[in-house]
Amino acid sequence: MLLQPACSPSVFPRPSAAPSAMHGSQKDTTFTKIFVGGLPYHTTDASLRKYFEGFGDIEEAVVITDRQTGKSRGYGFVTMADRAAADRACKDPNPIIDGRKANVNLAYLGAKPRSLQTGFAVGVQQLHPTLIQRTYGLTPHYIYPPAIVQPSVVIPATPVPSLSSPYLEYTPASPAYAQYPPATYDQYPYAASPAAATSFVGYGYPAAVPQALSAAAPAGTTFVQYQAPQLQPDRMQ
């Protein structure tokens, strides 16, 4: 007959406390923990605590520092004793702490973004070519990213990728001008004579004359006028 050794209850470890009991000991800081950003680098835990003491009791005030250098990273966390104190501390979203404007918000909400002042000017590169063509009557070949779609805006004299379009490959030295009488030269974006280049008609979007044209006609103005509706693609080929 085999005898089983008696085992005392002390041999086996006692079961640990239930997880709910352990989590119950931790206090909920959802509405009491405050994120403080925009702090100056000389702010310490003591100075951060000193500022928030005016709103109520504080359980913890910590400035986050860099592990390697030990310097402040510009933000920290403050845990208030109750929710009412946290609400009073967050009433001013941009207080002055240690001589610098900071931003304060509940930690679970994250950093509160500052208001951005958006302008009404819209760049050409932000608009779809189809929308520009329908609204302003311009073709995609005459859409220049550096400019704003507004009247009386001068396009800067910088190299623009759209100027390499096949519609603008005519130069004064090209024999293509011999195929057209002088009266038809005004139909093209670049005028053949300096006198024709001095007038501004059409949409009012002047552009800089390329170097080849400025060398051939030094007496003309540095801006010529595009006439997009008068272009004929079959004559450009």
UniProtKB/Swiss-Prot annotation:
SMART domains: RRM. InterPro entries: Nucleotide-bd_a/b_plait_sf, RBD_domain_sf, RNA-binding_reg, RRM_dom. Transmembrane segments: none annotated. GO terms for cellular component: cytosol; nucleus. GO terms for molecular function: mRNA binding. Gene3D superfamilies: 3.30.70.330. Expressed in cardiac and skeletal muscle tissues. PANTHER family: GEO13361P1-RELATED (PTHR48024), RNA-BINDING PROTEIN 38 (PTHR48024:SF28). Belongs to the RBM38 family. RNA-binding protein that specifically bind the 3'-UTR of CDKN1A transcripts, leading to maintain the stability of CDKN1A transcripts, thereby acting as a mediator of the p53/TP53 family to regulate CDKN1A. CDKN1A is a cyclin-dependent kinase inhibitor transcriptionally regulated by the p53/TP53 family to induce cell cycle arrest. Has the ability to induce cell cycle arrest in G1 and maintain the stability of CDKN1A transcripts induced by p53/TP53. Also acts as a mRNA splicing factor. Specifically regulates the expression of FGFR2-IIIb, an epithelial cell-specific isoform of FGFR2. This is RNA-binding protein 38. It comes from Mus musculus. The gene is Rbm38.
